[in-house]
Each structure stands twice: as structure tokens, then as C-alpha cells.
Amino acid sequence: MRRNGILSRLFLALVFLFLYAPIFVLIAFSFNDSKSNAVWGGFTLDWYRELLGNRAVLSALQTTLEVSILATIIATIVGTAAAIGFSSMKRRARNAYLAVNNIPLTNADIITGVSMMLLFVFTGQALADFSGWLNSQQWAADANLWFDFSFNLGFLTLLIAHITFDIPYVIVAVLPKIRQLDPNLAEAALDLGATRWTAFRKVVLPELMPGIVNGLLIAFTMSIDDFVISYFTAGSQVSTLSMVVYSMVRRRVSPEINALSTLMFVAVLLLLVVINLRQARQEASRKRQALRS
């Protein structure tokens, strides 16, 4: 038994080493004074200074954060509402909707990206033709009206694409919490005089919050990390951070990329730590309240 315990710990240590060794090497070489990715030339912060002075990177970072935050918020709201709606359906209808929801999760990103690009291009052209037809009407000319409903690939199409592929992840994260929820809790709140909104906000939502937070984190991570779908739906005027990194890597892997990747990793890590600490405090508070009651 003791030998098996040692072997299992050794195996676990090797797994974690395999997973995190590349990240530690990347972080270390982001402070390398040499441009080489194999030879250590001393400690420096120059690559971080150059990164902060790179306008293309900063612009892409701003776009990435704007798209990721907006897409995450919208996808979390829509996905949570959809998960609650699925839970109230009959089994056959629910299974059918869940099967449709799972298709984007298993679908290749390149297929999703190309199909969404074609949809946006087709829709933009159809709206442009419709605008032209409206402008050709005599009543529009008499009223001095000019219609233009057309659009090109850009920030809006990128945002819609991110919302679309984020929603299924939120649904999958929230559904297990809904299944664990005791339906009598909301009914008891209604019996005590609470409105449906108050019962949902005070009783149901706190129970679902761990799943909602997990879905939010997954959606944000998927959105900020996405390259393939963004590449096909962003157009030529908008660039995300992953697209800028790709263009930089095509030339050569510079220490600036190491510095940028390090900052992204640290930001996500800090976000996870803050959320986990918050959840731990909430769980401890609930246990204390349960003991008091």
C-alpha cells in the first residue's frame, strides 16, 4: 500500500511537471536578456517595456478584452436562461435541444469559423441589396431618405461569433447545478409571500451561482484564447491578441511573445485565485449559517 502511494504521487508529480514545465520555461525566458530561446543571457525587463510600447499589441489587447468581456456577459446571461428553460422541458424535447447544443462543442473550430464567415458575408450582401431596393423606391426619394443596412466583417461580427460559441459552454456548466437544485426551495419561498423574481434572485440564483461562475470562466477563457473563429470573422480591420501573436510567430518567436504570454497567464491565474477564494468564503459562510440555524 505504501509503495503504491509513492508511485501514485510520483506519477501525479510527473503529470503536473509535463503540464506546467512549458509554462515555467516560457515565464523564465520572458526575462531573458538574450533574444535566444535556448540560451540564458541574464535577467532583464526590456521585453516587457518593448511590449508595453507596441501599439499593435496594445490595440489588439483592448479589442480582445472588449470582445471577451462583452461576449462573456451576454453568453452567461443567455446561457443561464437557456439552461433554466431546458430544465423545465419534457425529457424528449430537452434531450433534442441538448443534442443540438452539444454540436458546437464537438464541431471543429475551422468549420464553425468558415460557416459563420459565409453567414455574415451572405447576410451583409442581402442587407445591402435590400437597402438598394429601398433607396430605388420613389417614396424614399420623395422623402429624401437613404437606407444602408449593410455591414462588413469587423468588431460586430467578431462579437456575435464569440457569443455564439460561448453560449453552449455556459449551458453545459449551469445544467448540473439546476439538476441538483431542490424544486421545493422556490415553492417554499413563494408560499412565504415572495414574488417569483424575489424567489429566483434570493433562493434559486445563489444555488446556481457556482455553475454560473464556472460557465463564465470557461466562456471568458475560450473567448480570450480563440484564434480560428476570430481569424475568419474579424475581417481585415480588427485584430485580436491571438491573431497578433500568430503574425509575430510567423516571422520569428521573439521574447516579446514570451512576455505577452506570461502576462496573459498571470492575469487568468489571478482571476481564478480571486474567484476561488470568493467561493470558498461564501461556502464557509453558508456552513456557519447552517450550524447556527
Residue ranges and their predicted role:
Residues 2-10, 134, 175-190, 200-202, ...:
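C-terminal transmembrane helix and the adjacent membrane-cytosol boundary/short C-terminal tail
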Residues 24-37, 116, 169-171, 211-246:
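Non-cytoplasmic
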Residues 36-41, 45, 50, 110-163, ...:
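Membrane-interfacial helix termini and adjacent extracytoplasmic/periplasmic loops
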